[in-house]
Swiss-Prot record:
Gene name per UniProt: rplP
Top-level taxonomy: Bacteria, Bacillati, Cyanobacteriota, Cyanophyceae, Synechococcales
Positions of region (Disordered): 147-179
PROSITE patterns xrefs: RIBOSOMAL_L16_1, RIBOSOMAL_L16_2
Name this polypeptide is given: Large ribosomal subunit protein uL16
GO cellular component: ribonucleoprotein complex; ribosome
Similarity-based family: Belongs to the universal ribosomal protein uL16 family.
Regions of compositional bias (Acidic residues) in chain numbering: 156-168
């Protein structure tokens, strides 16, 4: 199951889940995805159960990307203990999910929309929140997270060169003010 290798602090406060996901809300790797419709916590066990359900249905056909990671520790006190005497020990890990967050992605040459939809439906049953199936439109490509395409890098270089040319041509003379 998923859990961080090491963390700065062992315990966290529970926190609140307000608003919608502004990051991780677009398809980045595959053609099909499962998107959260409401907020909640998803445990590492639920993520693993969903992953197994999808891979069992897809078999060897395509590729599955897990877009969430359980990085929040949830503490629990032992049963039948009295109040007080500090916070309990970390028992399991959860991923904090906001509406709009992409949970899983699926893609590959052998994956059709019907196969992906059924695999995601099986994964939905393992999750404690409402989700929906989304697919890329025809001709649309996934936005690669953290990877800039060579075309976009070329456009950035051209923009930077044109800005430096404009700056050198417009800064013909410099006036100094003496006091």
């Amino acid at each position: 199951m998923l859990s961080p290798k090491r963390t700065k602090f062992r315990k966290q406060q529970r926190g609140r889940m307000r608003g919608v996901a502004t990051r991780g809300n677009k398809i980045a790797f595959g053609q099909f995805a499962l998107q959260a419709q409401e907020c909640g916590w998803i445990t590492s066990r639920q993520i693993e159960a969903s992953r197994r359900a999808m891979t069992r249905y897809v078999k060897r056909g395509g590729q599955i990307w897990i877009r969430i990671f359980p990085d929040k520790p949830v503490t629990m006190r032992p049963a039948e203990t009295r109040m007080g005497s500090g916070k309990g020990n970390p028992e399991f890990w959860v991923a904090v999910i906001k509406p709009g967050r992409i949970l899983f992605e699926m893609g590959g040459e052998e994956i059709t929309e019907s196969i992906a939809r059924e695999a995601m439906r099986l994964a939905q049953y393992k999750l404690p929140i409402k989700t929906k199936f989304i697919a890329l439109a025809e001709g649309e490509t996934p936005t690669q997270v953290g990877k800039a395409s060579s075309a976009s890098l070329a456009n950035l270089d051209e923009d930077a060169n044109s800005q430096t040319d404009d700056e050198t041509s417009s800064s013909g003379s410099v006036a100094t003010v003496e006091s």
